[in-house]
Amino acid sequence: MCFSQRRFSNGSEIQSYLFAEFKQRIATMQLFLKIPDFNKRNKKFQLAKHLFSFHYLYIKIGCGSAQSSLKTVFSLASTLAFHYLCRMKTELKENGGLPAHILWTLAIVAGVSVANLYYNQPLLNVIRHELGVSEFKTNLIAMITQVGYAIGLLFIVPLGDLYQRKKIILTNFTLLIFSLIAIGAAPDIYIIWGASLITGICSMIPQIFVPIASQFSRPENKGRNVGIVISGLLTGILASRVVSGFVGEVLGWREMYFIAAGMMLLCAIAVLKILPDIQPTFRGKYGDLMKSLFSLIKDYPSLRIYSIRAGIAFGSFLAMWSCLAFKMGQAPFYADSDVIGILGLCGIAGASTASLVGKYVKKVGIRNFNFIGCGLILLAWASLYFCGNTYAGIIAGVLLIDIGMQCIQLSNQTSIFDICPSASNRVNTIFMTTYFTGGSLGTFLAGSCWQTWGWAGVAGIGTVLTLLSLLITICHKEQQHAPFP
């Protein structure tokens, strides 16, 4: 019987009928929109409840007929319910599935935020000429940024297991806006160093996103979803070099950092509107949280191996990128920053490899992917050294080193989350801190070798680091993991 044909004896019966009908409409729209359970403690539910109570009182004191009031309540309640359900943020459940709109938001924001680490690479030569400093001092900008990133990974990312991740992310976006503006307005190299350190520390946001993709994806989709987020991250790295090279040539290197600050504001708004609150998984104090990192390192040898061999390979990767601007600025290229940035497009092959590696890492095996990755990086360095005075040799080297690096990074990073799923942020902290410490070491060694031996020295240190990563893989056998207490 529809409500227009129904008769009520008192207001209490009307109120009961309203609540039953309202819950039914909620359930219908939940089923249609695939939205999680309606939370009765939600403020909007309470608002609806007060609305019903108001109309109940309205009827009881005789100010209106039950039938007309009932029609009004249905109209208002339906509008309220639909408005709420369409705007409600999805509640995430572990292994319950990650909605596509959240997954792609994570991937896009990861790419835009990680780009802050790499804007400087095509601009180093331009910055050096404007500030009148040495190549070594200029190269320290890239190294300090990577060190800052490692610090952020070590001390901030673990907080995702202790506090709500959304608050951590928004705080870091706020600090990023100020640090990027400081770099753009810096009068000397020393302020750039300090602001670059803060930029590096706060740019660890993507490494909070990666555990989210792993933790809340269905088991069969974990590798694919982690690969999508990392693909977004890699695309951001590649695009950062292209964009900064172009902007540096057309507008100037300072303007690039002002634009980046504006992009961080947009990312903060996106996270605020789309990402749901995620409850922490660790109970205790920050000191206990940090101590648990050492327990994880001690108890899981595979975690140490995965992290170290990937970090050493990343050092080889960044050795190339940190000195490429200096190489391309000399004979026979004499290239400007926009040309150096365009070379970043060659790494699109590496970004496209990420989701593929994530999908097949279980079938092919971590060990095999590491052999493939190291082999490709060694071929890259051969091309960069023996054919380094031709665009063909440089492009081939960039392609090979990007694809090889993704084979190593993604196979190892995807596998670490299987070691201890309940400590996903801390496991990722250990991996990525080691990873970027290796990157910082490679950047520093490459800068020193460039000063002494030029491009041959850079190729030499890159090859040595790759061989060391390969040796670790050869000597290590994959192990099964016991659960972390």
Task: Give the location of each predicted region.
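Juxtamembrane intracellular "pre-TM" segments in multi-pass secondary transporters
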Residues: 89-96, 276-307
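Helix-breaking motifs and short loop linkers at transmembrane-helix boundaries and internal kinks
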Residues: 132, 164, 185-190, 387-388
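Conserved MFS/SLC helix-loop-helix module at the cytosolic interface between two early adjacent transmembrane helices
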Residues: 151-187
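Helix-to-loop junctions at the C-terminal end of transmembrane segments
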Residues: 153-164, 353-365, 450
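Cytoplasmic helix-loop-helix junction between adjacent transmembrane helices
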Residues: 197-231
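Intracellular juxtamembrane helix-capping segments at the cytosolic ends
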Residues: 205-217, 407-420
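Helix-loop-helix hairpin linking two adjacent transmembrane segments in secondary transporters
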Residues: 228-272
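C-terminal transmembrane helical hairpin of 12-TM major facilitator-type secondary transporters
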Residues: 368-408
